Design a protein with these regions (language model features):
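UBC/E2-like fold recognition across ubiquitin and ubiquitin-like conjugation systems
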Residues: 1-52, 58-143
């Protein structure tokens, strides 16, 4: 991500997300090798989730997004693997990786704020799954 794109992303996020709820890491100087964004999400039920967005190939590629803990489904199983109905991808770092954009939907014009919104919706549907047992796909079908 170049300097101009970083500034645009930072500006949009700071206008729409509390400034103390997100922070970019490794985006300047020599540390640009593994840039990432940490952003907090509060669901309607008041739960806090911390997200880690890997920006190493952003905006050319879909940024991998992880909930910074291993989530469990309603039955207590780890959401660690690829699941079409739960919209998860293979875990890394011991964290649940969520599927927020399909390859056919991705363009370099997609902002980190849009990624954040989709991840927030994913978490709301995850919490609905915990209440009802319905998979995330029940609320939002694949295109």
């Amino acid at each position: 991500m170049d300097k101009e794109r970083y500034q645009a992303e930072y500006t949009v996020l700071s206008q729409r997300v509390p400034e103390n709820a997100f922070r970019f890491f490794n985006t300047k100087g020599e540390s640009k090798r593994n840039p990432y964004l940490r952003i907090a999400v509060f669901t309607k039920s008041g739960n806090l989730y911390n997200l880690h967005m890997d920006l190493s190939s952003f905006p050319a590629s879909i940024p991998p997004v992880f909930v910074m803990k291993m989530l469990k489904d309603k039955d207590g199983n780890d959401l660690s693997g690829t699941s079409a109905c739960m919209h998860t991808l293979s875990s890394e770092h011991g964290w649940t990786r969520i599927c927020h954009y399909g390859y056919n939907d991705w363009t370099p014009a997609v902002s980190l704020f849009k990624v954040y919104v989709r991840c927030h919706l994913w978490l709301e549907m995850y919490e609905a799954h915990l209440q009802t047992g319905n998979p995330r796909d029940y609320y939002l079908k694949h295109a």
